Structures are given as structure tokens and as C-alpha cells.
A protein has these predicted regions:
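N-terminal export and membrane-targeting signals
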Residues: 1-17
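Conserved, mostly hydrophobic/aromatic
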Residues: 53, 151, 214, 257, ...
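Extracellular low-complexity, Gly/Ser/Thr-rich intrinsically disordered linkers
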Residues: 62, 129, 414-485
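Glycan-recognition patch characteristic of GH18 chitinases/ENGases
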Residues: 114-245
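Substrate-binding surface in catalytic domains of secreted glycosidases
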Residues: 166-184, 262-411
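Active-site groove signature of glycoside hydrolases
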Residues: 239-271, 328
């Protein structure tokens, strides 16, 4: 039985029990223990870092941390917050330092708090079939197909105001032998469709719960969105026709727009204005109807930053969900450092740029009126690192990017987990120091922390960039699936 199905069965049983009690939760006190106070743990301190399982007392009540936290006052974070009340305790010492929580939910969770229907999406790159030797079959052999709900196929291009197929050989023509194919059947020379698309069709036949979404743009191909925004209806028409081409009609369940970045700078700079993104998404929704319309968006939580410029709040009504790219905050493009985590969950001491963390970005997006259930937390299946580093703690100087398999300064998790194992955590993510190199990346343990936080915020789930960075047994995909409600 699939792990996904098992979780859904458990969730369904829980839901049924909830209905039987008319939506109420009843707690019956044990007459033998109800009057016995729990021994108090050391008093909560606002300056101390707590991780999942740590305990603290506050105002005569014992609390247990569900995940990483600092500065969040017990008793103020609510049912879905970080602190779980264990009841009254015998004796409590008030903390010597107190402050308001640095990260509190800005709204009650609007997503499903436990139905097993959270989204676990991941990007599959078209070019990964070459140097990375990562194919659709790897999604099956790794066990990831059991846990994923959605695969984002990256990337289609945007040219002359239209959606276009990028690498036709990889997408529709590459012939697969029997041992390379998802179903063990070799492609023939005369079949009308081969390549990734045919393999994905086979994958969906084997795992019908998986949705496949075609993503357009990305860092390299976002330059064409400005022209597309000049005639959104024509753009939407071209995208719809491409996704429903007769050769692969039925493969794609919707479209994903990865515009980096509307009304801001990425590889190129866009000056379309704050309404352009909204107009584009509105046109796509009108054309695609009930099919998925999603977008990968910036996680720049700085004041006046990319979130403020993109128009994401007004566009939210037209999308099924946003995939918030909560990674790539810091890296060896600043070759001298300071070393800092590229995918921090929360703010941390010595943070080079305030607002470059997941919690701040999510809070800012919520403040725009975007429902929590329409926000997915981003997880990177890779690390970013420096070389020439002399200290293991974050904040050290460096001499340049650390060597990587495909690009300096970046390396897959599947390599780093053995090459440079994690030595500590900062801001809710892991870092590693080895042989003068300093890396930051997520591990199954930090993913557990992040997904617990995502659940507490009522987020719609999580997504990852990208599948080839995971281990051969899909350790990170599984960690996300296990962590989401």
C-alpha cells in the first residue's frame, strides 16, 4: 500500500471520529492523576533556541516545543502554534527576559488541518535527462511517485508573447529502451510520441493520483513575459493550445507560471507594472477554466522588495496556489561571504539582510490577503556553499564559491549528505563545515521542522526544486510527505 494512501486512510478515520463527536473534542481527566501537577521544566527564555521536543515552563504551565522556535511566548501561539500545552506544573520561574514573538501566525489556518490532502509538488527538469541522467523512471525507482501529488515539468519557453516548447528532443522525441522506460517497454521508431512526455503519460497511468503541470519561464526564460503581458488573452490562448496539443492531450493538468520577476529584476528587468502579473493570471484562468493555474513566486520579504512590486495579492484570486521560492536567499555570488543559510525558515542572529527568510515572506504574502491554503513552502534539494572559510559557525568570511558538480557554489543534497554532512542548524535549516567549505542545505530533520511550521500556518503544502537533487531512495520527497498533515 502506498504511503500516501496510508496517510489518507488515517486522516479519513480521524475525520470520521471528529464527525461522531459533532466537531467537539472532549478530554476526560484521569481521576488518579488529574490532581497531580507536572514538574516544571526550566522557565521559558525569549533568547533561547528551542527545537522539537524541548520543554519549558511559563506562568505555571508546562509546554513542549513542536519544532524550532525562538522568542515565541508559550500560551500565545494558539492551537496550531509551536508550543503544545502539557497542563499545569508545580512551580514556575518567570523568565528574566521577555519579548513579543518574532513570528506569529497572521491568521488562523485556512487550509485543511489534517486531511492528508496537502500538496507535495516537485519540479522535474527537461534538461536533467542529459548530464544529470535523471529520467521519469527515477521518480518511480526512488519511491517518490508514491509520495508526490504534483510534478512541475520545467521549463517551457516564452517567445514572441507565446508559450513554446523548448527542447523538443528531450520532451517528445528521445527514444527510451526497455530498461530506461517507466513501464519496462521500449519506444519504437515509428510511435508518434516519445521522450519525457510519453514517459510522464505512462507514469500517470501507473500513479493516477499524480498531477502533471507544465511550468513556463524560470530564471532563464522569464524575459519573454513582458511581451506576453501586453496581450494576455493571446498568451493564454497559445499556452492552452500547446498544453492540449493532440500528440499529448491529457498529459497536463494545468499550467505553472514562473515569472522571475514581474515589475522587478531577475536575469532581466521587467517594467510591466504592478497590474501585469494579475492581468496575465486572469487571462490564464479565463482560458484554462477548472484546470490548475499556479505560479512560482518570489520570497523576497524585504520592505519595498519583489513581493511588494509583483501584484501577487490581487492576482491570488485567479490562481490555485503560489509556490513561494523560499530558497536562494544567500550564496557565493557574494564570494567573500558572510556565510549564511540560503533557505532559512526564520530570522537568525547575524542575518545579512532582514526579510530574507521564509517566515517573513509568508507573513508578508498573507498580509496581502492571500489565503494560507494558497501558499506552498519551497524546499531546495541542494545546498549553496563557499570555500576558504575558517569558521564553522555562520557569518564567516570566504574566498569564493565552493566547487560543485555542475556549477561552483551549488551542490545536490545527494552529494552533500555524505561529502559534507550537517554540523549544525541556523534559522531552521542545516549547515555544514568541512575542509574549509561551508554549506547550507535542508535535511530530512530540517524538513520535518519546516513542514510542521507549514502545517501550523495552514499552508497548502510544500514544493521542491528539483527532483534530481534527492537521493536514490527519495529521502527528501518522503520527508516532506511524512511531515505534511
Amino acid at each position: 500500500m502506498r504511503r500516501l494512501k496510508t496517510r489518507r486512510m488515517i486522516a479519513a478515520i480521524g475525520a470520521a471520529l471528529a464527525v461522531m463527536t459533532a466537531g467537539a473534542i472532549y478530554t476526560v481527566a484521569n481521576p488518579f492523576t488529574a490532581s497531580a501537577a507536572i514538574a516544571c521544566s526550566p522557565a521559558w527564555s525569549a533568547s533561547k533556541v528551542y527545537v522539537g521536543g524541548d520543554t519549558a515552563s511559563h506562568n505555571g504551565t508546562e509546554y513542549r516545543a513542536k519544532w524550532w522556535t525562538q522568542g515565541e511566548t508559550p500560551g500565545t501561539t494558539g492551537e496550531w502554534g509551536v508550543w503544545e500545552s502539557k497542563g499545569a506544573c508545580g512551580g514556575d520561574t518567570n523568565p528574566t527576559q521577555s519579548q513579543s514573538p518574532t513570528q506569529q501566525p497572521t491568521e488562523e489556518p485556512t487550509g485543511n488541518p489534517g486531511g492528508g490532502d496537502k500538496i507535495n509538488a516537485a519540479y522535474f527538469t527537461e534538461w536533467g535527462v542529459y548530464g544529470r541522467n535523471y529520467h521519469v523512471k527515477n521518480i518511480v525507482s526512488s519511491g517518490s511517485a508514491e509520495d508526490l501529488t504534483t510534478i512541475n515539468y520545467a521549463f517551457g519557453n516564452v517567445k514572441n508573447g507565446q508559450c513554446t516548447l523548448d527542447d523538443s528532443y528531450a520532451a517528445i522525441d528521445k527514444a527510451y529502451t526497455a530498461d530506461q522506460s517507466v513501464d519496462g517497454k521500449a519506444d519504437t521508431w515509428d510511435q508518434p510520441l516519445r521522450g519525457n512526455f510519453n514517459q510522464l503519460i505512462k507514469l500517470k497511468e501507473m500513479y493516477p493520483h499524480i498531477k502533471v503541470v507544465w511550468s513556463f519561464g524560470g530564471w532563464t526564460y522569464s524575459g519573454g513575459f513582458g511581451q506576453a503581458a501586453q496581450n494576455p488573452a493571446a498568451f493564454a490562448e497559445s499556452c492552452y493550445n500547446l498544453l492540449h496539443d493532440a500528440r499529448w492531450n491529457g498529459l497536463f493538468d494545468g499550467i505553472d507560471i514562473d515569472w522571475e520577476y514581474p515589475n522587478a529584476c531577475g536575469l532581466t528587468c521587467d517594467t510591466s507594472g504592478t497590474q501585469a502579473f494579475t492581468n496575465l493570471m486572469k487571462a490564464l484562468r479565463a482560458k484554462f477554466g477548472s484546470e490548475l493555474v499556479t505560479a512560482a513566486i518570489t520570497a523576497d520579504g524585504t520592505s519595498g522588495g519583489k513581493i511588494d512590486l509583483g501584484g501577487y495579492g490581487t492576482a491570488a484570486q485567479y490562481v490555485d496556489y503560489y509556490q513561494v521560492m523560499t530558497y536562494d536567499y544567500f550564496g557565493a555570488w557574494d564570494k567573500d561571504g558572510p556565510t549564511a543559510p540560503h533557505s532559512a525558515l526564520s530570522s537568525f542572529s547575524g542575518q545579512p539582510i532582514a526579510g530574507f527568510d521564509s517566515a517573513t515572506a509568508i507573513a508578508k504574502l498573507k498580509s496581502l490577503g492571500i489565503p494560507s491554503s494558497k501558499l506552498l513552502l519551497g524546499i531546495g534539494y541542494y545546498g549553496r556553499g563557499w570555500t576558504g572559510v575558517t569558521q564553522s559557525a555562520p557569518g564567516g568570511s570566504a574566498t569564493g564559491p565552493a566547487p560543485g558538480t555542475y556549477e561552483a557554489g551549488i551542490e545536490d543534497y545527494k552529494v552533500l549528505v555524505s561529502k559534507c554532512p550537517a554540523t549544525g542548524t541556523v534559522g531552521g535549516t542545516a549547515y555544514a563545515y568541512c575542509n574549509g567549505e561551508w554549506w547550507s542545505y535542508d535535511t530530512p530533520a530540517t524538513i520535518a521542522t519546516k513542514t510542521a511550521w507549514a502545517n501550523s500556518q495552514g499552508l497548502g503544502g510544500a514544493f521542491a526544486w528539483e527532483l534530481s537533487g534527492d537521493t536514490s531512495n527519495g529521502a527528501l520527497v518522503s520527508a516532506i510527505a511524512n511531515g505534511l498533515d
